[in-house]
């Protein structure tokens, strides 16, 4: 998969201020404020920056956290994980494998079959309804 690389100025011109803050500066939207936290429609969730398919509605679940949550990515090679030691804690950050956009974090408190909870920011996603 070929990497997408742009300057900060190019990303800022392409994205809304909130999308830019979340995806390019590792921000987090406030709980229960994101567009997709309670969306139940069938479809796919793409990276808002580059359009890479990240998650599907088939793996989405209500975690009660106020952020869109999934128990698995659409394709494991479309996301990357790295250790995040910010805010005086250790978490696992989830990034788009194509453009390095910050998507959210993954935790080990999700449902079966994976036991994982990919806790994503709506601002990092673009929903495409199933046709």
Swiss-Prot record:
Gene3D superfamilies the UniProt entry points to: Peptide methionine sulfoxide reductase (2.170.150.20)
UniProt xrefs under PROSITE patterns: MSRB
Record keywords, A-Z: Metal-binding, Oxidoreductase, Zinc
Domain MsrB: 8-130
Keyword Zinc in annotation: yes
Reaction(s) catalysed (UniProt annotation): L-methionyl-[protein] + [thioredoxin]-disulfide + H2O = L-methionyl-(R)-S-oxide-[protein] + [thioredoxin]-dithiol
Record has Kinase as a keyword: no
Taxonomic superkingdom: Bacteria
Biological processes per GO annotation: protein repair; response to oxidative stress
E.C. number(s) listed in UniProt: 1.8.4.12
Active site: 119 (nucleophile)
Binding locations of Zn(2+): 47, 50, 96, 99
Cofactor(s) this protein cannot do without: Zn(2+)
Note describing how the cofactor binds: Binds 1 zinc ion per subunit. The zinc ion is important for the structural integrity of the protein.
Listed GO CC annotations: cytoplasm
GO molecular function terms noted in the UniProt entry: peptide-methionine (R)-S-oxide reductase activity; zinc ion binding
SUPFAM superfamilies: Mss4-like
Family that this chain belongs to: Belongs to the MsrB Met sulfoxide reductase family.
Name of this protein: Peptide methionine sulfoxide reductase MsrB
Organism phylogeny: Bacteria, Bacillati, Cyanobacteriota, Cyanophyceae, Acaryochloridales
